[in-house]
Amino acid sequence: RRYRMSSDSILIVEGIHGLNDALTPAIPESHKYRIYASALNPLNLDNHTSIYVSDVRTLRRMARDNRTRGADAEKTLTSWPSVRAGEERNIFPFQERADVMFNSSLLYELHALKRHVQPLLEQVDRDSAVYGEALRMLDFLSFFTPLADTYIPQNSIVREFIGGSCFD
């Protein structure tokens, strides 16, 4: 769909492809201000074991896809390599073009997600091709104490994944 904007209009392009200039070829570079949001977890499990950003994003997606699409953990884990390939092709090449980066990770996020994703991971069948990955994720989650949803503010970004947002 085509839109005509006045000279004082503001256009917000939200979503994973928002930094791709193919979406806004008619807007001069000098009129663009790009914001990139990503879950850049600042925690380590110990002095030698960092937390992979990809793991946090996988758990976010698992919680959200289960809540919004009824997808189980096996489906999320099976589709994750395709998701990652899409990111490598359509998102990461453009992230350096951002004027500012917003870290959307929260220190309590993994505690909050655990309540929602642990039961899903425990349901992955032993015969599944992603069973090993489910076990790895469960082992990773064992470092975190579950946090009840009642302690999570309704305006927290975590609510996008677990539900109950005041913005829904």
Tell me what each language-model feature is.
Residues 1-11, 71-80:
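ATP-dependent small-molecule kinase phosphotransfer cores
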Residues 21-168:
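Conserved NTP phosphate-binding and transfer environment spanning the P-loop NTPase/kinase superfamily
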